[in-house]
Every structure is written in C-alpha cells, then in structure tokens.
C-alpha cells in the first residue's frame, strides 16, 4: 500500500530480501502484462555492482537496462541516475536551477574538483561568528537545510525551520551564513561546477515538474539497499523517481552502519512508512563473539532509525567463531608493522592449506588518505595489497578500502 522499510544489522538478510523482492516484482509485472520498470539502487558503485551480480545469479533470464524509460531492471547508484536525468533535461534545466539553487544554470554536469567551501570560508569567514567558521558546518547546513527546502533567497532562509541541526542561529547569524552560501553558489557558477547534492536536487525537481505536465515517472518500483546514509537530496530523488502507490518504494537500512552521523527522518521527504516497517534480528553472517565485541561499543551510544525512533541493537547469531583480536600500537609505524606481520601470517596459513583467495582479506580504514598511506606502508614492509575505490574488488591481493566502500561487502578476514 506504499513505501516499506526493513531494518537490521549487517548480516541479517536485508540485501537478500531486496534482491529477491526486485526479482519477484519483475516477474509479477511481466505476468500481469506490464513491462518491468524497476530500479535497485544503493549508495556506492561497489555495492551496485555486487547487487547486479546477485540479481543475475538469482534469475539469469531477467532483463537488465542501462537507460531510463526502458523495460527491465536497472541496478545503479543514485548519483548515476541523477546524471541520466540531467542529461535528458539538457539546457531546459535552467528554470529548475533558478528555483532550486537561485541561479539559472544551463550546464550542471561537471563536479567540483576542489573544496569550494574551504575556499569560500577563506574569503568570507571573517564575517561569521567563531563557532560557525567551519567548511564542514557550512556544507552540512547547505545540504541538510537549504537544498532540501529549495531556499533561493535570504528572506526564505530567515523563515525556514532547521530541526535537528544542533546549532541555533538567530537572524544575524543566519544572514552571515547566507552570505557564505551565496558566495559558494557564485563561486561554483564561475567555475561551471555543480555538486553531487545539487545534481540530485535538480534531478528530483525536474522529475516533479515533468510529472506535473503528465509525463510518467521513470520507474514503477524502486528498491534501496544501505539506505541509512542517504542524504535529503537522495531521498527527494527517490520519491520523485516513482509514483506513490503499492510497492512503490522499499528501503533496507541499519542505523548502526550510518557512517556520516546525519540523522534523517523519512517522513520529512514524503516517504511515509508508519505501519510498514519490520526489523530483522537474526544475524546470519556475524559470529556471537563479534556481536558481543560490537555490543561493548554500541552500548555506549544511543541510536535512532530513519523514522526518529529509538533503536535497540540486540541480535542473535547461530554462528560461533574466534574471539576478535585487538592489537595495541604505540604509533603509526608500529601499527603498520603489526598489520604486516598479521597479513603475512594469514597469507602463509592460506598457502599451507591450499586456499588461493587473498582478495578475501581486507584492511579497512577511515578515509582514502589513510588508505593510500597503508598501501604504501605495507609495501615498504614487503606486503603487496591493492587499494580499492570505485572499481570492483580484483583477485590476487588483499584489499585496502575505506569503511564507506566496504559497506555491505563481506570478507573472510
């Protein structure tokens, strides 16, 4: 009867359900004489590639599509879908851009290559109160408040609500923040660039305009894996991609895997799931020992789901395994040395047992800068590993990737 949300920890079967549901909806539509128009999407390209493999394995005869409006199942990241929409809109996006970002831009497909917010802060930061002189704060305010509400003027910004932001802004502070936002928009216009979030917002607004003119929305069903890290602009695009109705939106999420710490409430973006939410508590991937170790960390915090409800994190697991090993290091060199020793030990054990799958061993890090430093540091210690970003995990070496890129993937060690 409308959008549905399932939640659960890593290994509880959320992705399995999403994949089976996509295949079942495609079969059901085909049996009913309707062309399947289904989007199965997630946050990163790595996960999208993995989802496509799983769908093809479950139903080899299923038709995939790479183009909007064609029959079949599209498996893609949302950023890529937004670009398809903007390519279709062409220069006609200008009036939409005026409405969404306050400037009638005709070219919106080029991304910024540098931190424009930091550049703007260096120019206008002196006019901001000390507690607001942060590029991260300005970017977050823009993406969480300004873009979702399509604020184009100072007068609009002075009136809007800012729930959940944690920083109160009076009129004087809002005016100072708005000067920075205007500076950002002017600078990106000069550079001819448009951010990912702006592209998502523009694509959503374009689809809403087309629907108001009687144009059908691109999909009949949209399914989302790893929904907890989607931004407001992502959620607005999801809502715009499919007409409200039975089986329109399906979201799988886990608040404990939220990387960016920005709490989002689905109902604020037209996605009503009240009465259509289910929680999975049986963990098929993680051992009891790993769960116990994780609970020791999670018990120190409080978590909310995508409807703003407090979320408990007690899961059960039928699997048992070794206790997690926590290694203490005095500095980065010591840390790399211990990591190299452990990787060498594991690879040697695999060779002795006849197992040839080094790519099933992963080193997870905080960001891409640490990733590159770890790859170089391990190479200096004669351990060859492979850095993984947007590309698929290759064979032949252990992999090093950020927690962001590892989301939803599974490794042996």
Predicted regions mapped to residue ranges:
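Short glycine-rich substrate-engagement loop in P-loop NTPases that contacts/grips substrate
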Residues: 193-201
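Tryptophan-centered motif/residue detector
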Residues: 116-118, 141-146, 178, 235, ...
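Pre-Walker A adenine-sensing motif
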Residues: 1
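Conserved helicase motor core of SF1/SF2 NTP-dependent helicases
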Residues: 4-36, 43-58, 62-71, 76-93, ...
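ATP-hydrolysis module of ASCE/P-loop NTPase motor domains
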Residues: 91-173
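A general alpha-helix detector
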Residues: 119-124, 141, 183-184, 202, ...
């Amino acid at each position: 009867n409308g959008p549905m949300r399932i939640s659960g920890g890593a290994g509880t079967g959320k992705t399995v359900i999403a994949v089976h549901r996509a295949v079942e909806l495609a079969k059901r539509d085909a049996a009913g004489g309707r062309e399947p128009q289904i989007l199965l999407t997630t946050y990163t390209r790595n996960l999208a590639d993995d989802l496509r493999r799983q769908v093809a394995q479950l139903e080899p005869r299923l038709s995939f599509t790479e183009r909007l409006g064609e029959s079949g199942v599209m498996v893609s990241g949302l950023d890529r879908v937004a670009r398809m929409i903007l390519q279709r809109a062409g220069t006609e996006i200008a009036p939409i851009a005026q409405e969404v970002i306050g400037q009638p831009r005709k070219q919106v497909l080029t991304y910024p290559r540098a931190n424009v917010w930091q550049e703007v802060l260096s120019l206008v930061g002196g006019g901001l109160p000390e507690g607001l002189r942060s590029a991260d704060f300005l970017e977050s305010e823009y993406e969480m408040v300004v873009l979702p509400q399509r604020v184009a003027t100072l007068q609009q910004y002075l009136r809007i609500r800012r729930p959940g932001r944690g920083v109160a802004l009076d009129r004087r502070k809002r005016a100072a923040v708005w000067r920075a936002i205007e500076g950002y928009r002017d600078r990106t216009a000069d550079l001819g660039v448009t951010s990912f979030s702006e592209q998502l917002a523009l694509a959503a607004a374009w689809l809403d305009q087309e629907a108001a003119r009687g144009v059908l929305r691109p999909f009949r069903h949209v399914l989302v894996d790893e929904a907890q890290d989607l931004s407001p602009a992502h959620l607005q695009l999801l809502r715009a991609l499919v007409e409200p109705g039975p089986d329109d939106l399906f979201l799988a999420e886990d608040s404990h895997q939220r990387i960016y710490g920005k709490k989002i409430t689905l109902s604020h973006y037209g996605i009503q799931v009240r009465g259509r939410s289910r929680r999975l508590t049986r963990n098929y991937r993680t051992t009891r020992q790993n769960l116990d170790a994780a609970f020791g960390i999670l018990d120190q915090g409080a978590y909310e789901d995508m409807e703003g409800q407090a979320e408990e994190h007690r899961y059960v697991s039928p699997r048992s395994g070794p206790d997690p090993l926590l290694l203490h290091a005095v500095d980065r060199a010591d840390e790399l040395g211990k990591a190299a020793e452990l990787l060498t030990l594991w690879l040697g054990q695999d060779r002795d047992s006849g197992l040839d799958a080094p790519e099933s061993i992963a080193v997870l890090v905080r960001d891409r800068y640490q990733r590159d430093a770890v790859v170089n540091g391990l190479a200096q210690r004669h351990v060859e590993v492979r850095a993984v970003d947007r590309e698929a995990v290759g064979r032949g070496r252990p992999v090093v990737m950020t927690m962001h890129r590892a989301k939803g993937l599974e490794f042996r060690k």
